[in-house]
Structures are given as structure tokens and as C-alpha cells.
Amino acid sequence: MTSKPSGSVSWFQVFQRGQHYMKTWPSDKRLAPVFPENRVASATRFAVRFMPPLAVFTLTWQIALGGQLGPAIATALFACSMPMQGLWWLGRRSVTPLPPTLLQWFHEVRNKLAEAGQAVAPVEGTPTYQALADLLKRAFKQLDKTFLDDL
């Protein structure tokens, strides 16, 4: 992340914001070269789904074969931490203010929505990546798919 996230949020709120940001971010292939969110969100979804069973399997396997318990617990904890790492990154990213280059792009997309006759709420403070995700999600729903080509 290029700049420090705005405001202070608790660690639990960071996970909640990460989950909200993951659900809000549009998973369009044209955004993938510019933003890492598509890759992080898909890896996090995969980790949420498969890492807890993998942790249980690892523990069960090591205990059943009479292996050492220490490495088994370490592996299980690492596997369980993978989804949390993704949600943490997404949560921190969601409250990070947009850099100047993306800020200009953010305002161009807002103007395109306004030109299309959509009501656009005024921006409060410096826009964050969450505001960009909300705007892009709305633009993908209400504008034609070529709006990214013009930017």
C-alpha cells in the first residue's frame, strides 16, 4: 500500500471491512492488470473454503501416524491463518486513501455516472479504495461495459 490508511479501526473491524470489500469489489478481468484485488479476493475465498478442512486433516494425519504434534499444530495454525491474512490485507486496503493517479480516474468514472443521469453522492473527504469499489460496482451495473475503454 502506498499511503497510510485513514482513521484507526479495531482489528475485528479490519476483518469485517475486508469481507465487505471482497464482496463489493467487481471481479472484472479488465481490472486485474491494474488492481491486485481480484487475485487476493479469489485466493482469500479459496482459503476460507479449503484451509480449515486442510488444517483438520493435517492434525488428524499427524496424530494418526504418531508424528510430532508441534509441527502439526504449526501447520494447522498456518493453514487457518491464510484466510485471515487475506481478509486483513483487504480490510487495510479498503480504508487506504486513493493515490493521485487513481483519484483522477475515480472522478472520471463519477463524471461518467453523472453524465449518464445517475445520482452521485458528494465525496466526503479523501476517497478510499472502498469508495472506488462501490463506484466501480455501480458503474458496472448501470453503465455499458465499454465505459472502461474510454478512460
Curated annotation (Swiss-Prot):
> Under the cellular component aspect of Gene Ontology, which terms does the record hold?
plasma membrane
Tell me where the transmembrane regions lie.
Answer: 46-64, 70-90
Q: Which InterPro entries match?
A: UPF0208
Asked if the record carries the keyword NAD, the reply is no
Cellular location(s): Cell inner membrane
Q: Give the UniProt keywords, A-Z.
A: Cell inner membrane, Cell membrane, Membrane, Transmembrane, Transmembrane helix
The principal location of this protein is membrane
- The identity of this protein, by name, is UPF0208 membrane protein Spro_3315
Species this protein is from:
Serratia proteamaculans (strain 568)
